[in-house]
Swiss-Prot record:
Gene behind this protein: pgi
InterPro entries per record: G6P_Isomerase, G6P_Isomerase_C, Phosphoglucose_isomerase_CS, SIS_dom_sf, SIS_PGI_1, SIS_PGI_2
Active site: 355 (proton donor), 386, 514
Protein name, as recorded: Glucose-6-phosphate isomerase
GO-annotated biological processes: gluconeogenesis; glucose 6-phosphate metabolic process; glycolytic process
Disruption-associated phenotype: Increases acid tolerance in rpoS mutants, defective in glucose metabolism.
Described function: Catalyzes the reversible isomerization of glucose-6-phosphate to fructose-6-phosphate.
Compartments where found: Cytoplasm
Catalysis performed (reactions): alpha-D-glucose 6-phosphate = beta-D-fructose 6-phosphate
Keyword Secreted part of the UniProt annotation: no
Amino acid sequence: MKNINPTQTSAWQALQKHYDEMKDVTIAELFANDSDRFAKFSATFDDLMLVDFSKNRITEETLAKLQDLAKETDLAGAIKSMFSGEKINRTEDRAVLHVALRNRSNTPIIVDGKDVMPEVNAVLEKMKTFSQAIISGQWKGYTGKAITDVVNIGIGGSDLGPFMVTEALRPYKNHLTMHFVSNVDGTHIAEVLKKVNPETTLFLVASKTFTTQETMTNAHSARDWFLKTAGDEKHVAKHFAALSTNAKAVGEFGIDTANMFEFWDWVGGRYSLWSAIGLSIILSVGFDNFVELLSGAHAMDKHFSTTPAEKNLPILLALIGIWYNNFFGAETEAILPYDQYMHRFAAYFQQGNMESNGKYVDRNGNAVDYQTGPIIWGEPGTNGQHAFYQLIHQGTKMVPCDFIAPAITHNPLSDHHQKLLSNFFAQTEALAFGKSREVVEQEYRDQGKDPAQLEHVVPFKVFEGNRPTNSILLREITPFSLGALIALYEHKIFTQGVILNIFTFDQWGVELGKQLANRILPELGDDKAISSHDSSTNGLINRYKAWRA
């Protein structure tokens, strides 16, 4: 990958001039001037996904200039580098190959002179065999009973992805009950353990190194809880499996290393649901549905790696995001799924985007003088409408939004879905076009009221509109379409990182807090006053000690 400061490109300078021309143009004007706007600014993927980006403050010229920026920063070369196994994560000297995990074509992908696909397929086959034994009831616990509950113990990418997917695919789930524990707060594991039976529970310990503080603390607490009933440590092997590469530590914990599922250093945590970390997904929805998830992602990988930029959905969404982030000064993006099963989707890509592109140092090691990754947030519709949409509609901050919905629901209850989708369609229309003062006054007249007498209220009922949105309409949320949707966002994030000249696949920003926590932990072991930190941290620690006494 080339290390190019985007602000020094001619395309960036052209975009700055173009922004000056576009900043006062409204979405309403853009639609009024082009009856074919929807056709020009929307695209479908495999007849399963419609992406409508017409309600944005963009023209064909805008997109052309943004695509020039992608060319000048050598996006095409970066895509080729990632898919070919080049070590584009240079700060950790690693390839970035989550795409290999879902490479259903099985074409060779070479890292350090070795095709990784045989190992990928071997782990998949091992996961298939193990999961079938658990799901069928063939696998027995220490008292001879079949497994009924699965507890995934992980954090970050070892939790957020599997939890999001198992929730999104609940309509496909089998009889096993899934639980997820991540927080080192003892409340999390304690509340889950209240719900399960040690005789029929399988724990998955998801930690590549088997040393992650939060995960191993929870794993040892789960083991202690289990042994209070089971007694003999040999029974641990029937109720614990590991998603790890540290065979020595896994064996010492009491887990049979035959039930250790490996993944590789070219799998980043927040891109790991496609790997052995996805074992909880397989146990929830079955191996065939997991393969469909992989296949959907692979289809999007193929689209991303082969489709020209002007029709490439991840690239288009990435470029539009840069337009708002770097030229309009928008600091956040909202992800708003109109599907309750997708309630963890925004949280998943909060990590996916903010841990990837939340960087202030460029690939040359220099501090940037431009904006990098945005703040990502969101909640399912229609709940968000009764919470934070007020600010999106009438606040002073621009919040570009992605609205996501399925045309077909898994729960066709009465007219619920029509009401849900009526809100989905209405919100993007309202955000784009607003409501003028004239319309508000006419509404009063239609009600037989004199607008002049209500002059004090009229300004508060005016909506400026001109608030940008993308609409992503899925035919139905299936394992395949969900896989494609996740990969769409992954590649959007990568595209933005390439153009913004940052390393998307490391996360050094999480390390300092860990180091300081390891230093502070021993200081909490006694009641002595602390003076080794700044006055604020000392004061907080000492008050904690006083109150716990």
